[in-house]
């Protein structure tokens, strides 16, 4: 009945349609006959939310090469090791071929000084070339909208979830036993429906954006937009320069997991202090109760 009212569907005439909506949005494995006609690659709730629309498809192909010490050294600088890379489907590429939006084909080949790393998704790929001044980030396939990295690796329940500015930050946090995701960029609009779903799974959702001007501005904007979901912001004690602005830089500078937990404890203490102050304002001193209210009109 509730779904019928919400979608404006007649309960009797559209009963089967209502069932299909419930099955699709809850990721239920029923109505096998209908699913056989319309095969779905991934049947989880979070994936369906992230695949409502896609950008134009760009054809691509690539050749994977094994990680060696040189290729792993870049990630090890941030405390990210091969087990974390594999869990998030990060690969090293020997070559990558695609075409521009205008249809012009091109090929990139990795070298010791310009490695090519790939974040491999379902039907799409994001290329990362950290040492390249041009074409540093590339996309191939059908990119989901919104793009969200790390969603598949999240547990069903957790204490804290961090919203970061990039994939490397997600990997840095995961390598230290923290849960994190990122969208396409810090300036991307975070869908409220996703935050609403995550709020049911995590006790605290914390924005952990860069400490530069853009990151601080966007963090404040998102905190305002998502105030109804009690999203908080944690500002890192960094200078905000190119080499000292995000959580990956924070760990690369020598800070440990325990140092980061200290920042979190300070943030949570401030949150709970504010809550206790609000609660105390509602307390009644029974030894000195307030005066009884007086009626303005006596009958």
Residue spans of the language-model regions?
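Short Cys/His-based metal-binding microdomains
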Residues: 1-21
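Terminal peptide-recognition signature
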Residues: 3, 75, 165, 173, ...
